[in-house]
């Protein structure tokens, strides 16, 4: 039997109806996944001390330390007044010059010193830009699970998978909408079902097609009412991120944000 031609108008109508049905199904599935992601994220935050403890945590201090093959290769000392946005970062730049930057993360304005001398012009601009980058990167390595519900963060449920070491993990996928310095980054946070602990994260930076990098989140300690992971070894790589001299306080220490005395 010869197949009868289907009128173009009917094809168009079927296409619209099918598209609408698929969109509705996809939307419902997406909403369900996002609701699951929200629930897991909230349970994770509750297990780490809860939002009331986060709201009370005004000042953070920490050293962001990079370890390669067991040896320290970089260290950046941070202080952050989360209420005002005032920030201090101290380290050594790529040329080996020690620097200090005092700025505000909201306005991105501030002052910089290199080799103890006030930076001006282009040098100042570069120091401020680099300091803001350190703020974005280094605080995220410390505080990522506390920032799951920040504006511009899209949280989706990416299924259940066996946890390394046993048990089951719920995996949360993080993507970003016009926030941060690299909004195309993707992160997957593995959360244990037993005790709701963040076990590790995987990430792909800048929309790359490379396999995800995995870093374990270990050495959890309670600081100022917040649970924080202080050790992040890379899986399959000779690198490790450590956090030292960590302190969380409900009040600001003004001396941390004061400019250095004139020589």
Residue locations for each model-derived region?
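Short amphipathic beta-strand/extended segments with alternating polar/hydrophobic composition
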Residues: 75-80, 100-105, 119-130, 214-217, ...
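Short, surface-exposed linear segments at secondary-structure transitions and domain or protein termini
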Residues: 82-89, 109-113, 130-135, 222-226, ...
């Amino acid at each position: 039997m010869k197949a009868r031609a289907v009128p173009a108008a009917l094809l168009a109508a079927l296409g619209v109806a099918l598209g609408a049905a698929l969109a509705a199904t996809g939307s419902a599935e997406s909403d369900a996944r996002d609701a699951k992601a929200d629930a897991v994220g909230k349970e994770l935050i509750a297990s780490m001390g809860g939002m009331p403890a986060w709201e009370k945590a005004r000042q953070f201090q920490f050293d962001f330390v990079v370890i390669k093959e067991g040896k320290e290769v970089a260290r950046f000392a941070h202080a952050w007044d989360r209420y005002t946005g005032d920030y201090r970062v101290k380290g050594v730049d790529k040329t080996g010059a020690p620097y200090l930057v005092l700025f505000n993360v909201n306005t991105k304005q501030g002052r910089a010193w290199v080799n103890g001398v006030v930076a001006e012009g282009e040098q100042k601009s570069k120091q401020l830009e680099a300091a803001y980058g350190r703020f974005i990167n280094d605080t995220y390595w410390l505080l990522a699970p506390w920032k799951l519900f920040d504006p511009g963060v899209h949280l989706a449920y990416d299924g259940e998978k066996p946890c390394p070491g046993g048990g089951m993990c719920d995996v949360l996928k993080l993507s970003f909408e016009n926030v941060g310095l690299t909004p195309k980054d993707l992160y997957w946070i593995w959360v244990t079902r037993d005790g709701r602990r963040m076990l590790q994260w995987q990430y792909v930076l800048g929309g790359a097609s490379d396999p995800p990098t995995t870093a374990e989140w270990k050495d959890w300690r309670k600081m100022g009412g917040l649970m924080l992971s202080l050790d992040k070894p890379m899986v399959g790589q000779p690198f490790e991120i450590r956090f030292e001299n960590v302190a969380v306080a409900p009040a600001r220490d003004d001396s941390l944000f004061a400019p250095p005395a004139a020589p």
